[in-house]
Amino acid sequence: MIIATIGSHSALQILHGAKKEGFQTMVITDNKRENFYKNFSFIDNIYAYASLDEAVSIINGIKDYGILIPHGSLVEYLGKERVDKIETKIFGNKKIFEWEADQKKKMELLRKSNIKIPEIFERPEDVDRLVIVKLNGAKGGKGYFLARNKSEVKEGIQKLIESKMIRDENEVIIQEYVVGVPMYFQFFYSDIINRTEIFGIDIRYETNIDGLRRLPFEYMKELKINPTFVVVGNIPAVARESLLPVALEYANNFVRTTKELVPPGMIGPFCLESIITDNSDIVVFEFSGRIVAGTNLYVNGSPYSWLYWDEPMSIGRRIAREIRVANEKDKLSLVVS
């Protein structure tokens, strides 16, 4: 069996973990990155593509003996139509992709999981406080903007339309901006052992908002630079232990809801992207239904994964172990779609 993934996002971690669990590994990459991946001995096969259609053909070439591990770049790069043409087994529940690509469906899933979320405004006219306007899909924060009132919301949406990032206002979600500190809680759900594991926590390092924070207030006021939220890196974090029971409760609620609304439900890694308020409330503003790039911080294991496994366990390796154990128990169908 060969473990494959697209060359981006968390590919190195995924393939490193797969090799640790005894699998052959394969990266399918843009030909501009081929030389980069040649630097890593744990990657057994490197296939470079010149077009996205060729990428799909390469993936389908291993359908009889391979498993594709999805990450944030899969749908964002290939597009939904091409992903639908993939015949190779995909780790996880690919029905989640559709929910993850739509901000409004995302929030519906969180709400039905009895998870505390920010208020959502259906129309710009309803805005009565500071909001953040977000685009659909895994765009790493690109195009997001803050607005204080309905006029600023309308103005920002119009700029997105003019730049062709969206077609109309239905392609954004207007969300209350919750003041607090960000914490992105990473989890792994195993149907094989019926357990939700809290894996790690990260904070996104975003430009230019994190750079603006270093400026004195009077400079920021004078420069009049609008903050942007493009993710360029990740910072590790450990939460107060008193926060963890609520975070894990939210994760278990989320798993149960996905089983009801998106059967067979959540499989493998996911992330509840949250703000912690000064009342220690965890407010979840988004989820990712697959491996997140913040797990790249923990290639040698996280403070939490050590508590479960007592050995180095990245999410990449955890995925590979789930596949290996499922295959050994003749339950591979439970972890792929």
Curated annotation (Swiss-Prot):
Gene3D superfamilies, per database record: 3.40.50.20, ATP-grasp fold, A domain, ATP-grasp fold, B domain
InterPro entries: ATP-grasp, ATP_grasp_subdomain_1, IMP_biosynth_PurP, IMP_biosynth_PurP_C, IMP_biosynth_PurP_N, PreATP-grasp_dom_sf
Keywords: ATP-binding, Ligase, Magnesium, Manganese, Metal-binding, Nucleotide-binding, Purine biosynthesis
Reactions catalysed: 5-amino-1-(5-phospho-beta-D-ribosyl)imidazole-4-carboxamide + formate + ATP = 5-formamido-1-(5-phospho-D-ribosyl)imidazole-4-carboxamide + ADP + phosphate
Residues the record lists as binding Mg(2+): 273, 286
Binding-site residues, 5-amino-1-(5-phospho-beta-D-ribosyl)imidazole-4-carboxamide: 9, 73, 234
Annotated SUPFAM superfamilies: Glutathione synthetase ATP-binding domain-like (SSF56059), PreATP-grasp domain (SSF52440)
Molecular function as annotated in GO: ATP binding; ligase activity, forming carbon-nitrogen bonds; magnesium ion binding
Name of one Pfam family that matches: DUF1246
Xref: PROSITE patterns: ATP_GRASP
The keyword Manganese belongs to this UniProt entry's keyword annotation: yes
Transmembrane stretches, start-end: none
Cofactor binding comment, as recorded: Binds 1 Mg(2+) or Mn(2+) ion per subunit.
Ligand binding (ATP): 124-184, 206
GO biological process, one term: 'de novo' IMP biosynthetic process
EC number: 6.3.4.23
Cofactor(s) needed by this chain: Mg(2+); Mn(2+)
PANTHER family associated with the record: 5-FORMAMINOIMIDAZOLE-4-CARBOXAMIDE-1-(BETA)-D-RIBOFURANOSYL 5'-MONOPHOSPHATE SYNTHETASE (PTHR38147:SF2), 5-FORMAMINOIMIDAZOLE-4-CARBOXAMIDE-1-(BETA)-D-RIBOFURANOSYL 5'-MONOPHOSPHATE SYNTHETASE-RELATED (PTHR38147)
Entry's family note: Belongs to the phosphohexose mutase family.
Function: Catalyzes the ATP- and formate-dependent formylation of 5-aminoimidazole-4-carboxamide-1-beta-d-ribofuranosyl 5'-monophosphate (AICAR) to 5-formaminoimidazole-4-carboxamide-1-beta-d-ribofuranosyl 5'-monophosphate (FAICAR) in the absence of folates.
Protein name: 5-formaminoimidazole-4-carboxamide-1-(beta)-D-ribofuranosyl 5'-monophosphate synthetase
